[in-house]
Design a protein with these regions (language model features):
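Acidic catalytic motifs of isoprenoid enzymes
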Residues: 2-12, 16-315, 319, 381-389, ...
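Long, compositionally biased intrinsically disordered regions
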Residues: 404-411
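Short, amphipathic alpha-helical segments that act as regulatory/interfacial helices
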Residues: 114-117, 334-345
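Membrane-interface, cytosolic juxtamembrane amphipathic helix immediately N-terminal to a transmembrane helix
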Residues: 411-425
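Membrane-proximal, acidic/low-complexity disordered segments on the non-cytosolic side
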Residues: 443-460
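Amphipathic alpha-helical protein-interaction segments enriched in hydrophobic
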Residues: 324-338
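ATP/Mg2+ or Mg2+-diphosphate-binding catalytic cores
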Residues: 347-400
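Hydrophobic alpha-helix feature that most strongly marks membrane-spanning transmembrane helices
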Residues: 308, 312-319, 342-349, 367, ...
Length: 460
C-alpha cells in the first residue's frame, strides 16, 4: 500500500499508464455544518477521478500484513502506525496517496494530523450526539490526545473507527516529535472551539462565511504550513505567514461549498451566506427553481468571484515552497479548485446536479501540477475560461473582471522570477509515486474483497 510513497525504489511509469482506471465520486451524508478537511476532500475527489478505491471498511488487522509495504518500511513501522495508515486509506480514500507521497517524518505527522481532525470532524457530524454532550466534547477534544485510553464508541458515523480506536491514533500522536504535537494539539483546540460556536449558528454575512471557512479549512492550512516548517523541509516563513495559509484553506472550502449547493440544500444544510443569496431569493433553496435561474446564476457568480480573491495569495504561497513533495501536496488541490470554479461559473448545472471535473482533466492536472510554471499556466487557462463567460449584465461583472486582472498581474509578476526549488526527485517520478500509492490501495482493496468472498464461500 505504501510502496510508492514510503520508499524511493525505482518502478516503471508505463505500468501506471496501463493500469490507470477512472470512476465517478460518491455522495456524502447529511450533517450540519459541512465536514472539515475541505482541501483534502476537494483534491481527493479529483484524485478519485484518477483512481477510485471502492472497499468496505474492514478491521485494521485485515490489511496488516499487506505485501504492498516495502520491506524496509514494514520493519520500521510499529503495528499502531501501520493501523493509522490503514485508517488513513479508509477515511480519506484515494487522496491518502498524496499524503503518503510526502517526504520523511512529515508523512507520519500529516497522517496523524489528518486522523485527529477526522475524529474531531466525526464528532461534529454525528447528529445523534446531543448538543449538551457534543459541545464540551468539541471544546475539550485536544485534551483527549494525552489520555491513553480515551475513545468514543457511541458514534454511528461512517468514519467511527477513528473514534472507536482513538487510543491507537493518540498513541502515535504522542510518539511524534514535540514540535509536531504542539501544532496538532493547538489546531485541534482552535478548530473544536470554532465548530462548537457554529453548531447552532448559520452563516449570515460574508464576514461570517470567511470566519466559518477559517475554522473548518483555514486552520487546516495553517496547521499544515506549520508542520511543513517544523519538518525543516520548508522555510520558517511558510509556517509563520498565517494569512497566506488561511487563504489556501478558504479557497478550497469556498469551492466545495459553491459546488455542493444542490446536495447540501437537499439534505437540509445551508452554507451559502445569507448576505449573498438574500439579494436574489427569499429562501436559499428557491435558487434551484427553474424560474429563478437568472437570479441563481447571479448569486453563484458573486460567490465564485469572492472565492477567486484568494488566488493571488495561493500563487504567493506556492511560489515559496522548496520541497517537491510538499509542493505537489499543496498544488494539486488548488489547481483542482480553480478548474472546478471555472466549470461552475455561470453554469446552471450547479442547481440541477453535480458539476465535476472530467476524468481525463483530473489526471492531467495531477500529473502536470508539479512546478510553478505549470501551475501558472493552469491558473491562467482557467481564469481566461471564466473571463470568457462573464456576462455583460452580471451584477458582479466589475468585481469579477477586477479580480481576474489581479490574478493575471500576479501570475505575470511571479513568472518573471521563479525561485529555485530543490528537487529531491523528478516531478514525473513523484507524480507516479502518488499514482502508485493510489493504485496499490485499489489493487489491495480488490484482492482483499476477493479473499473475503472466498472465505465467506468456504464458511457456508
Amino acid at each position: 500500500m505504501l510502496a510508492g510513497a514510503c520508499c524511493k525504489c525505482p518502478f516503471s511509469l508505463s505500468a501506471f499508464k496501463r493500469s490507470l482506471s477512472v470512476a465517478p465520486r460518491g455522495c456524502g451524508s447529511a450533517s450540519p455544518p459541512r465536514s472539515l478537511l475541505p482541501g483534502w476532500r476537494l483534491g481527493e475527489r479529483g484524485l478519485q477521478e484518477a483512481a477510485r478505491a471502492r472497499s468496505a471498511v474492514r478491521p485494521a488487522s485485515f490489511y496488516r500484513h499487506s505485501a504492498f509495504f516495502c520491506l524496509s518500511c514494514q520493519e520500521s513501522m510499529s503495528d499502531s502506525l501501520r493501523t493509522c495508515y490503514v485508517y488513513l486509506n479508509q477515511t480519506s480514500r484515494s487522496f491518502a496517496a498524496v499524503i503518503q507521497a510526502l517526504d520523511g517524518e512529515l508523512r507520519h505527522a500529516v497522517c496523524i494530523f489528518y486522523l485527529v481532525l477526522r475524529a474531531l470532524d466525526t464528532v461534529e457530524d454525528d447528529m445523534t450526539i446531543p448538543l449538551d454532550k457534543k459541545v464540551p466534547m468539541l471544546n475539550d477534544f485536544h485534551t483527549f490526545l494525552y489520555q491513553d485510553e480515551w475513545c468514543f464508541t457511541e458514534s454511528q458515523e461512517k468514519d467511527r473507527q477513528v473514534l472507536n480506536d482513538f487510543p491507537t491514533i493518540s498513541l502515535e500522536f504522542r510518539n511524534l516529535a514535540q514540535e509536531y504535537r504542539d501544532v496538532i494539539s493547538d489546531i485541534c483546540h482552535r478548530m473544536g472551539v470554532g465548530m462548537a460556536d457554529f453548531l447552532e449558528k448559520k452563516v449570515g454575512s460574508m464576514k461570517e462565511w470567511d470566519q466559518y471557512c477559517h475554522y473548518v479549512a483555514g486552520l487546516v492550512g495553517i496547521g499544515l504550513s506549520q508542520l511543513f516548517s517544523a519538518s525543516q523541509l520548508e522555510d520558517a516563513e511558510v509556517g509563520q505567514d498565517t494569512k497566506l495559509a488561511n487563504s489556501m484553506g478558504l479557497f478550497l472550502q469556498k469551492t466545495n461549498i459553491i459546488r455542493d449547493y444542490l446536495e447540501d440544500t437537499q439534505e437540509g444544510r445551508a452554507f451559502w451566506p445569507k448576505e449573498a443569496w438574500s439579494q436574489f431569493a427569499g429562501r436559499l433553496e428557491d435558487l434551484a427553481q427553474p424560474e429563478k435561474l437568472e437570479s441563481a446564476l447571479s448569486c453563484l457568480n458573486l460567490l465564485i468571484t469572492d472565492a477567486l480573491r484568494h488566488v493571488p495569495d495561493v500563487i504567493t504561497y506556492l511560489s515559496r515552497l522548496r520541497n517537491q513533495s510538499v509542493f505537489n501536496f499543496c498544488a494539486i488541490p488548488q489547481v483542482m479548485a480553480i478548474a472546478t470554479l471555472s466549470s461552475c461559473y455561470n453554469n446552471p448545472m450547479v442547481f440541477k446536479g453535480v458539476v465535476k471535473i472530467r476524468k481525463g482533466q483530473a489526471v492531467t492536472l495531477m500529473m502536470e501540477a508539479t512546478n510553478m510554471r505549470a501551475v501558472h499556466t493552469i491558473i491562467s487557462h482557467h481564469s481566461e475560461e471564466i473571463l470568457q463567460k462573464v456576462s455583460l449584465t452580471d451584477p458582479s461583472r466589475d468585481k469579477t473582471l477586477h479580480i481576474l486582472a489581479l490574478i493575471r498581474e500576479k501570475s505575470t509578476l511571479s513568472q518573471s522570477s521563479f525561485p529555485s526549488r530543490t528537487h529531491h526527485l523528478s516531478p514525473m517520478y513523484l507524480s507516479a509515486a502518488m499514482l502508485l500509492a493510489a493504485l496499490s490501495w485499489q489493487y489491495l482493496s480488490t484482492t482483499a474483497a476477493q479473499a473475503q468472498g472466498t472465505s465467506d464461500m468456504q464458511g457456508k
